[in-house]
Each structure stands twice: as C-alpha cells, then as structure tokens.
C-alpha cells in the first residue's frame, strides 16, 4: 500500500488539473490494485493451460489440445515438442546413436519436452548429458513423464541448466555423439548455435569415431536460411551428410551429421547394435527396427549438399548472417512446410556406395529402390487429399501407396497405413478390406501382416 500512497500524494501535489493526471496514473493504479494475469498463452480450441512458468529469459507453458496431447511452448511462439511428436522426437535421438558403432558418452544440446533425450535410456552402456538454457523448461519436465519416464531417476542421464555454447567450450571430456535439438534461428540467441565457431568447438569435443548431429526444423526455415546453415556446417564438416528424421510433410526435419571418420552402415547393423528385447521394442515403436530403415533415412553426402546450398557466406560470430535472415521467416506469410522438403529431396542426390559398407549389388539395388519409394511417398503425401472417412481415404491413398510398394516392398511407411485402413474397413466394408489385403499380398509377398489379418 506504500506505493498507492505515493501515487495519491503525487496526484494531490500535481499542479495541473486532476483529469490530466488521471489517465496515466489511474491506469497504473488499476494495474497495481486489480489482480490481473499478464500471461499471454495461446490455448488450442478445446485445450487447456496445464502449467506455466515465468523466467528471466522466457515464459514457458505446457498446454494440452482437445485430444489431450501436451505441448511445451516458449514465449507462446516456439513449440518445443510434446506428447504428439513422440514418434519424431524419439527418432531424433535414436538415429545419431545408431550411426555410431558403440557410443559410450553422448551430449544433448537442448531438452525441450525431454522425449529425444529419453531415447538415450535405451542404450545400457551409454551415459548422456543434456543441456538446457531455460531453467523453467527443466522444471516442467514432470508433465511429460508419460512419454519420457522419470529422467531424473536414471543415474546414467544427467540434466543441467546452462548455455550450450559455454558448456561446449568448457566441457572436460570428449563425447562419442553430440545431438543438437531443433533451434529456430530467430529465437533469442539461437542463431549463435549455428555459427562456424560453435561447430568447430563441437568438433573438438568429438572422440575419434565421434559424430555430431544438428537437427533442423524445415517447417520453420526458408531456403536462404537453410543454405546458410548448410554452408556453415560443411565449412567445418566437409564430409557431412543429410538425413531425414521421418517422412512427415507437415513438420519435416532434416539432420546434418558430421564426423571425423566416414559413416558406414553394415548390412547386419540391427543384429550388431540391438542386443536387448527392450531396445528392439523401443526401435519398433518408431519404425527403426528393420534393416533398411536406418540407411533409408540418408539423403546425400557433403558434395551433394554443397551443390544444393550453392556459393555464399557462412554464419560466424563476426558475420552473424542468420541473426538478420531468420526473423524474416517468422513475420512473412507462411508457406507450406512441405515446399522446402520437396526442394531438398529433389535437389540432393544419394548413392548407396556413400553409406553402405558392403559392396553388394543386391544391397545397393534394394536401398536405391527404398529411396525412390521414400521420395514417392513424400510426394504422394503432398498431393493426397486427407479425410477422416475410411472410404474416402481408401479412394485417396490406395493407388499412390500401392505404387510406392511396387517400387520397394521394403518401404514400411506405405505398407502399415494400408494395413490399418484394411483393419478399419473390415468392420463396415469387409469386401473392400479383403480386396485391399489381397493387393497388399501381391505387392509385398514377403510380409505376413496382410495374410494374418485376412485369417481373422
């Protein structure tokens, strides 16, 4: 009440008529005396605000949508993962860890909802550190334990609140794998995480066979910004490569992976790396449990990326071009997330010999077919009309996905949606379901799911 007293005294002593003073001072009095929340949080229709923290650097909230999925948001603008992106987030952790032959120490830069970091728990010989700039993000992790487990209970996993660049510059030991989360360059300070100097410091941290993966949110970037990041990355990791986290056209994610040695995948990588059933089941949940799923995510090597990005400046501390480029994306008219993804898959060429250890004609042919199917699947995803009605959906996706499977019967992302659709149709349209299952048996005879479903 002392503040109110001083304000009233100010009004009495002020020499101008009272009404001149009333508007600004009265407004201030209202703000002080009336308890009003100044939180600005956009809540989805049918959703709710689950938790909120105001911090020195940012406001952080957990919101749920009408389906009950929880999302972590920073400053109500940047969504940092959640329960609905479990599939994608987990793959972002598994792919780099699987590409290293035997990781013992891993570093995760950025925590978000903790789902990517939680993938480290599936590797029994791995110790992992996770660094998060915003302390309030770590405070809200318990709201995502359904997807992550209780991370603090695992003595192999360590969570720390710190600045990523400072931690990297002062880390006392090397890491086999470093995974950098999805940082939007327009977020305060995030552009500095894409500088040449930062990439060099990370390279200095890597062990002899170490690798660094920088995930990029294609759905929050434009071509100019992406090219700048790629050029900067290749300036430090000339043998870098590009990988897709998944095949979604709504929120595509590209991974740039750099290493001190060439990355090669053995044909029996799955048997070599996955010793425990729990680990296999974890990979199965995110469709990384088949031999071609890991090399199938590969897009191209450093030379292909260099051609794609073209000539131009790199992002550095002295010339922070991303600092000025990235904010333009936030405020310009939104484009379809798939547009940049299509530019990437059309503009970056992959060759089986770039990534496969074995010099087998059959293995090379299968992987090439898988890549063709993958690209066709992505293109079909941008062209197909969506529907919640199973009959309409059958009409829209049956032929495109069967065509994909004819290209590569190994391509599971086209097979399982049709299996699921056949299962739904079996209750209301058994003849249509049976016809679809017969067609699946014909294009993918080595798979058994269609046959099993027909017998029930």
PLM region spans:
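Soluble small-group transferase modules, centered on the S-adenosyl donor enzyme superfamily
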Residues: 4-100, 105-107, 146-147, 163-165, ...
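The AdoMet/dcAdoMet-binding core of the Class I SAM-like
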Residues: 53, 85-230, 234-237, 242, ...
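Alpha-helical repeat scaffolds
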Residues: 393-403, 429-443
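Alpha-helical junction/boundary sensor with strong preference for TPR arrays
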Residues: 401, 408, 425, 443-447
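Conserved small-residue packing positions in alpha-helical repeats and bundles
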Residues: 380, 419-422, 455-456
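Short coil/turn linking the two alpha-helices of tandem helical-hairpin repeats
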Residues: 385-389, 422-430
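TPR alpha-solenoid repeat register
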Residues: 413-414, 449-452
């Amino acid at each position: 009440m002392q503040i109110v007293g001083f304000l009233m005294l100010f009004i009495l002593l002020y020499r101008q008529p009272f009404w001149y003073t009333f508007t600004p001072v009265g407004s201030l009095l209202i703000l002080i005396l009336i308890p009003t929340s100044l939180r600005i949080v956009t809540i989805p229709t049918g959703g709710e605000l689950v938790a909120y923290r105001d911090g020195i650097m940012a406001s952080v909230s957990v919101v749920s949508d009408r389906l009950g999925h929880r999302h972590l948001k920073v400053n109500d603008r940047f969504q940092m993962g959640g329960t609905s992106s479990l599939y994608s987030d987990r793959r972002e952790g598994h792919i780099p860890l699987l590409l290293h032959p035997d990781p013992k120490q891993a570093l995760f830069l950025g925590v978000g909802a903790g789902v990517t970091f939680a993938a480290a728990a599936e590797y029994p010989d791995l110790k992992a550190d996770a660094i998060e700039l915003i302390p309030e993000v770590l405070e809200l992790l318990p709201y995502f334990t359904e997807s992550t487990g209780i991370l603090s209970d695992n003595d192999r996993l360590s969570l720390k609140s710190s600045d990523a660049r400072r931690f990297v510059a002062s880390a006392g030991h090397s890491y086999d794998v470093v995974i950098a989360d999805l940082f939007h360059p327009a977020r305060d300070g995030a552009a500095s995480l894409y500088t040449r100097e930062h990439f060099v410091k990370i390279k200095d941290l890597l062990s002899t066979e170490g690798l660094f993966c920088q995930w990029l949110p294609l759905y929050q970037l434009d071509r100019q910004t992406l090219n700048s990041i790629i050029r900067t990355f290749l300036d430090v990791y000339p043998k870098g490569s590009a990988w897709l986290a998944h095949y979604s056209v709504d929120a595509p994610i590209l991974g740039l992976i750099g290493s001190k040695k060439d990355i090669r995948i053995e044909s029996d990588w799955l048997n070599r790396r996955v010793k425990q059933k729990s680990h296999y089941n974890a990979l199965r949940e995110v469709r990384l449990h088949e031999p071609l799923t890991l090399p199938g995510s590969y897009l191209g090597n450093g030379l292909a990326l260099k051609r794609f990005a073209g000539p131009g400046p790199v992002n550095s501390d002295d010339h922070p071009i991303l600092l000025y480029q990235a904010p333009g994306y936030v405020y310009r008219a939104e484009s379809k997330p798939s547009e940049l993804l299509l530019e990437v898959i059309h503009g970056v060429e992959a060759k089986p010999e770039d990534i496969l250890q074995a010099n087998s004609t059959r293995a090379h042919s299968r992987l090439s077919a898988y890549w063709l199917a993958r690209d066709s699947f992505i293109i079909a995803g941008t062209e197909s009309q969506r529907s919640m009605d199973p009959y309409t959906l059958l009409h829209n996706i049956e032929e495109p996905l069967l065509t994909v499977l004819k290209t590569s019967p190994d391509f599971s992302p086209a097979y399982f949606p049709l299996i699921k659709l056949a299962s739904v149709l079996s209750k209301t349209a058994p003849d249509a379901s049976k016809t679809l299952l017969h067609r699946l048996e014909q294009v993918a005879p080595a798979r058994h799911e269609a046959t099993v479903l027909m017998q029930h």
